[in-house]
Amino acid sequence: MNYTPITEENIEKVATLYMNHYNQHSGGCWTYEKAYKRIRQMVTMEDSLCLMQEDDNDIPTGLVIGYLESYDDFTFYYLDEILIFGEYQNKGYGRLLLQEVEQRVRERGAQMIELVCPDDAHHMHFYGGFGMAEATNLRLMK
């Protein structure tokens, strides 16, 4: 498995993959421009860690976007989105990608990963496999 940083030089490729995945597999209505803007916002953020996952034949299998956030005595990685492309889901690619992210953010000084995910059994099972649990000290406000 190969992990390539998503940078301003490869956003076009990533935006196309992102748009196609959500439009084909999730009934999305993404345009290339909106996908490009979303990925670029994360990539250009200070202390971002955004990766493209590719198999050994250089075929993209997924991506992760997020950033490190620092406080006076604590740094965490906010995992904004992890995406495994449709045909690669439920084959261990997500586990490998999150393991890679864990290693890289620890090397950069993060003590933990924080995220918001859908409240369903699939996501709870996936993240629970990494020792993550629902935060009891936070409430989502809208």
Language-model features, listed with the residues they occupy:
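Conserved GNAT-fold acetyl-CoA-binding loop/helix
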Residues: E8, M19-R40
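Conserved hydrophobic beta-strand within the GNAT/NAT acetyltransferase core sheet
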Residues: L79, I113-C117
